[in-house]
Amino acid sequence: MNEIKEFFEKAALNWHNKDDISLIKRILKESGIKKDDKVLDVGCGKGIITPFIYEITNVPVKAIDISENMISGAKVNYPNSNSLIFECHDFYEYNDDIKYDYLIFYNAYPHFLDIFALSNKAKEILNENGKLVIAHGMSREALLKHHTGLNSEISRVIGTPIEESKAFFDHFDLEKWADNETYYLMILKKR
């Protein structure tokens, strides 16, 4: 079993969504997501950001995670929701007939170890001019402390948005970024 998948299968058992809702809404506003946009929530965990995406788009939102336990938790958190579609998938292997306007990675990006593969897959499933939003609800410094002690097969140290965006330059332009004491954000636009 993939080490990341195994880690999150175990972590899901005690995982609680306790993010700052006002920060989530701010990040979504900054991302530019609007009504009728098709959004894929990648590495959704138990779905902390998914209902807020739906509040903006008013179209069903698909959310994927590599962990079956996380997806089960998301379905428990949002029962009987036809608007929030939670499915277990490895993003690198994800295939869909739908092309998305936005891919959002919220609190998940450090666990995607192959950024070049991430960039290629994002290019494949985004519409022309689609956007890749990479965000974390804590600063890069806090994230580094949070992930201290994690195996490098599970998480990686992320650089500044400028440094990280270089891996995406074949397919994307860095449109907007933030790296402050509150949150981390990269918005990349597909060329």
Task: List each language-model region with its residue ranges.
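A short acidic, Gly/Pro-enriched loop at the edge of an enzyme's catalytic core
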Residues: N95-Y102
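Short alpha-helix
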Residues: R156-H171
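Conserved class I S-adenosyl-L-methionine
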Residues: M1-G32, D36-G43, V133-R156
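Class I SAM-dependent methyltransferase SAM/SAH-binding core
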Residues: K46-Y92
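A short glycine-rich, Lys/Arg-flanked "PGG" loop and its adjoining helix->strand segment in the class I
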Residues: A117-E128
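A short SAM/SAH-binding and catalytic strip from SAM-dependent methyltransferases
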Residues: Y102-D114
